[in-house]
Curated annotation (Swiss-Prot):
Protein EC: 3.6.1.23
Protein name per the record: Probable deoxyuridine 5'-triphosphate nucleotidohydrolase
N-terminal signal peptide: none
Keyword Hydrolase among record annotations: yes
Involved pathway(s): Pyrimidine metabolism; dUMP biosynthesis; dUMP from dCTP (dUTP route): step 2/2
Keywords carried by this UniProt record: Hydrolase, Nucleotide metabolism
Organism: Methanosarcina acetivorans (strain ATCC 35395 / DSM 2834 / JCM 12185 / C2A)
Role noted for this protein: This enzyme is involved in nucleotide metabolism: it produces dUMP, the immediate precursor of thymidine nucleotides and it decreases the intracellular concentration of dUTP so that uracil cannot be incorporated into DNA.
Classification via Pfam families: DCD
Length: 171
């Protein structure tokens, strides 16, 4: 497993399908070892969720969109939120990705909770934003909040991601 550099990421962004679509400013979002994703939407999580072994009883709680102010800022009190990214990611069958919050979030008392991004996944993903700071946290629409680190797999997978979140938020 090898972490991809910005040079390799640039090639994949230009390939078909593009590794990343709908970037706000791709030159700013390409970092030495990853791609930054930007904030499209924020929602509150409403209700109870449930996870079981075979997903037959899985329930993702409803979410209520929050509105940005006229200046595109939003103040978030301490708590948890769902964030949706602007970018659509297309992960090739020989790559996987791990997402990390930008260090600026952590320095402000907030972080992101994410999962592994599997080979073959395509979509505009969601993550959980946790605001720990008792004074809250301000975010601007299109802020760069997460960095995706892409790793080459030892061999291409035979079958890529095919779960319920495939192509999420792309319609």
């Amino acid at each position: 497993m090898t972490l991809l550099s910005s040079n390799e990421l640039r090639k994949l962004i230009q390939a078909t399908p593009h590794l990343l679509e709908n970037a706000v400013d791709i030159e700013t979002q390409i970092q030495p070892n990853g791609l930054e994703l930007t904030l499209k939407e924020i929602k509150t999580i409403e209700g109870v969720g449930a996870v079981d072994f075979d997903n037959s009883e899985r329930k993702v709680p409803d979410a209520k969109p929050l509105e940005f102010e006229d200046d595109d800022w939003i103040h978030l009190p301490k708590g948890i939120y769902k964030v949706i990214f602007n970018e659509i990611v297309n992960i090739p069958m020989n790559l996987a990705a791990i997402a990390k919050p930008r260090s600026s979030l952590i320095r402000c008392g907030a972080t992101l909770e994410t999962a592994v991004w599997d080979a073959g996944y395509r979509g505009r993903s969601e993550s959980m934003l946790v605001v720990y700071n008792s004074a809250g946290f301000r975010l601007k629409k299109n802020a760069r909040i997460m960095q995706l680190l892409f790793y080459t797999l030892n061999s291409e997978v035979e079958e890529g991601y095919s779960g319920v979140y495939q192509n999420e938020n792309t319609k």
